[in-house]
Regions:
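Dinucleotide-binding Rossmann-like beta1-alpha1 core, especially the glycine-rich loop
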Residues: 71-147
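Glycine-rich FAD pyrophosphate-binding loop
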Residues: 43-63
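Helical element adjacent to the flavin cofactor pocket in flavoenzyme catalytic cores
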Residues: 129-138, 157-211
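Residue-level detector of anion-binding/catalytic polar loops
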Residues: 47, 112, 141, 180-181
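N-terminal Rossmann-like FAD-binding beta1-loop-alpha1 element of flavoenzymes
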Residues: 20-50
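Helix-loop-beta segment of a Rossmann-like dinucleotide-binding subdomain
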Residues: 110-120, 145-174
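Short, hinge-like loop/turn segments at secondary-structure boundaries
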Residues: 66-70, 161
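Extreme N-terminal leader/targeting segments of oxidoreductases
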Residues: 1-25
Length: 212
């Protein structure tokens, strides 16, 4: 099924890899995570090549809900139990900072985005209550929705206001312009650890560059 994001955004095609290519870092996978990783490295002066077995952003990214949020399920009650209040706070801050950096990229490239409240629903009122308490304990603004407008029965939903939804393929299109990308280039084998690393695909060979 063609995703909603493809209706108004077509990504450019990239050649398949043939022959031998040398690079400092090879990024395997051309979703948003791979594109952002490659860009971060390139911005720091690293020679990067990205390979994708199909087309970039054709799998998970193409069908994502495109949320930029620090709320990833009912996790903060679990984090407090496992790594403590300080660790849970650091987790939130790291994700909030990453969200701001991603929104800054969207603003820089003129990618459409919209501020929205993010919600996580559950059939357990106890779990929702525990999560709401955990968020408040960490000083995270949180809200409770008694009857979320969903086509299924729930016990409510816990939300964090001021999160964001964006157009993932329009961001990917801008990121891809700056990168060396090979599509239809699935990696079949990795050879070597630490030194003389190689990634092998049919009819091609990627090797770690050696610079003096």
């Amino acid at each position: 099924m063609r995703s909603v994001w493809h209706r108004d955004s077509l990504l450019p095609e990239h050649p398949a890899l043939t022959g031998e290519v040398r690079t400092d870092v090879l990024v395997i996978g051309g979703g948003l995570a791979g594109l952002l990783t490659a860009r971060e490295l390139q911005q720091r002066g690293v020679d990067v090549v990205l390979v994708e077995k199909d087309r970039i952003c054709s799998a998970t990214t193409a069908h994502t809900t495109a949320k930029i949020t620090a709320q990833h399920g009912l996790i903060y009650q679990k984090l407090i139990r496992s790594i403590g209040t300080e660790g849970a706070t650091q987790y939130y801050r790291a994700n909030a900072e990453a969200a701001e950096r991603l929104k800054e990229l969207c603003r820089r490239f003129g990618v459409p985005m919209e501020e929205k409240n993010n919600f996580v629903y559950s059939s357990s009122r106890q779990k929702l209550g525990d999560e709401l308490s955990a968020l408040h304990k960490l000083g995270i603004p949180a809200i409770f929705e008694e009857s979320p407008p969903l086509p299924i029965s729930t016990a409510g939903a816990v939300g964090i206001p001021g999160q964001t939804q964006f157009h993932p393929l329009k961001l990917a299109k801008h990121l891809a312009k700056e990168l060396t990308i090979y599509e239809n280039s699935g990696v079949m084998e990795l050879i070597g650890i630490y030194y003389h690393n190689r990634a092998i695909k049919p009819y091609a060979d990627l090797r770690r560059a050696h610079k003096n």
